[in-house]
């Protein structure tokens, strides 16, 4: 333990801590809104809503900290945002107890997929250009969001963009910190902060008994398994691979699904490997040295602990920020990741067409057969890859 603490102290950096904080900030300011919508549809109490947030925050914290320390890799976990969107469409046709049962079913199935090793084999089968095209497509909307935010709060967004350019030139390591300070300062002085009452209190998790039904299993558990594996773990592992980390999928999926199992009883949806926010912790902005970026994963987990303990209060605090500031912050923070993934996708001449098809299908937002554009981008891109590049029979 003493050796571990000494190593953590030596490797700690402010830039990695900021990267971890920004990942939590974006998670709470974006996907968490879907949770509020689901809670309203389910007509749950404020106490139950806080329990949900406590469960997903602590679940993401424990897995992220453990895996980041274990593999010295910036492993960032979160809750399934696509799965949460499913809840909005299903409530109030299913009860909260049925939803919890579906979470448990999904966690068990995902755990079995992880420990059998089949997911690792699937990951090795996907070419780097296809994975990069998919990731660029996922992140592209955030780059667009940066400039779309100028429609409503142009002064704040353009000031953040200018601050980004200046700090990238003179203080690149703490660039995003200056951008955050700039955005908050302009929002405050222009009176654009959201009027949210702050009341700091400790969260108390609520136990929810599961109630199995075929309806919730087929309409929530099964889609949750698919979107978690194809829309979260798959791009999440692809990001790790593209960032130069060869962490196996088996322990990550196993740890996340076990955390999901326990979080479910407090109302927490499936814990998954983060894809979008993970890029914040894996680039040079987190740390110049790749081997020291794991601190960002640990910092991310620690901020999630704070978010879980003060669930209601922390969410209210993040809710102060205007959505345009959050959109601009996310877009600027992910510019480097967007550029690097587009570069990798277009790097090899042979893979360029399949990678471009993957990118366009992913960024399209298509939902054919109810499955996400991430899934279809990967499938269509792989189909193009095998048709165009498979050796012809002599």
Curated annotation (Swiss-Prot):
Query: How is the protein disposed in the membrane?
Result: Multi-pass membrane protein
N-terminal signal peptide: none
- Name of a matching Pfam family: BenE
A molecular function (GO) held by this record is:
benzoate transmembrane transporter activity
InterPro entries linked: Benzoate_Transporter (IPR004711)
Q: Which GO terms describe its biological process?
A: catabolic process
Keywords attached to this Swiss-Prot or TrEMBL record, sorted alphabetically, are: Aromatic hydrocarbons catabolism, Cell membrane, Membrane, Transmembrane, Transmembrane helix, Transport
Segments spanning the bilayer are: 16-36, 49-69, 74-94, 99-119, 139-161, 176-196, 220-240, 252-272, 301-321, 325-345, 368-388
**What compartments host this protein?**
Cell membrane
Any single Gene Ontology cellular-component annotation: plasma membrane
Listed NCBIfam families: benE
Further information in the entry reads: The ben operon encode the proteins responsible for the degradation of benzoate to catechol.
The job of this chain, per UniProt, is described as: Probably involved in the transport of benzoate.
| Protein known as | Benzoate membrane transport protein
Give the originating organism. Answer: Acinetobacter baylyi (strain ATCC 33305 / BD413 / ADP1)
Q: Which gene encodes it?
A: benE
């Amino acid at each position: 333990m003493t050796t571990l603490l000494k190593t953590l102290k030596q490797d700690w950096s402010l830039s990695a801590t900021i990267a971890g904080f920004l990942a939590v900030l974006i998670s709470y300011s974006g996907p968490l809104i879907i949770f509020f919508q689901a809670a309203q549809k389910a007509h749950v109490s404020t106490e139950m809503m806080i329990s949900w947030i406590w469960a997903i925050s602590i679940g993401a914290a424990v897995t992220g900290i453990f895996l980041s320390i274990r593999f010295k890799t910036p492993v960032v976990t979160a809750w399934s945002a696509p799965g949460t969107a499913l809840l909005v469409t299903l409530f109030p046709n299913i009860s909260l107890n049925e939803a919890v049962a579906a979470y448990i079913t999904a966690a068990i199935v995902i755990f079995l997929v992880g420990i059998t090793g089949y997911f690792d084999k699937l990951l090795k089968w996907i070419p780097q250009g296809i994975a990069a095209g998919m990731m660029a497509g996922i992140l592209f909307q955030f780059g667009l969001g940066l400039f779309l935010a100028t429609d409503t709060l142009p002064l704040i967004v353009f000031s953040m963009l200018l601050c980004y350019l200046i700090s990238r030139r003179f203080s690149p390591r703490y660039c995003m910190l200056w951008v955050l300070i700039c955005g908050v300062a302009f929002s405050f002085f222009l009176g654009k902060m959201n009027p949210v009452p702050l009341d700091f209190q400790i969260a108390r998790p609520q136990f929810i008994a599961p109630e199995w039904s075929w309806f919730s299993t087929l309409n929530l558990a099964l889609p949750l398994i698919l979107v978690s594996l194809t829309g979260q773990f798959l791009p999440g592992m692809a990001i790790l691979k593209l960032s130069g980390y060869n962490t196996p999928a088996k322990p990550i999926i196993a740890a996340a699904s076990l955390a999901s199992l326990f979080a479910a009883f407090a109302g927490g949806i499936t814990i998954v490997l983060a894809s979008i926010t993970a890029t914040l912790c894996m680039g040079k902005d987190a740390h110049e040295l790749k081997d020291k970026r794991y601190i960002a994963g640990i910092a991310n987990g620690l901020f999630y602990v704070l978010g879980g303990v003060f669930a209601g209060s922390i969410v209210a605090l993040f809710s102060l920020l205007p959505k345009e500031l959050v959109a601009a912050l996310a877009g600027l923070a992910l510019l480097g990741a967007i550029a690097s993934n587009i570069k990798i996708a277009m790097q090899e001449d042979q893979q360029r067409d399949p990678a471009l098809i993957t990118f366009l299908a992913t960024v399209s937002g298509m939902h054919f057969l109810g499955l996400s554009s991430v899934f279809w981008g990967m499938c269509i891109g792989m189909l193009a890859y095998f048709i165009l590049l498979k050796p012809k029979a002599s």
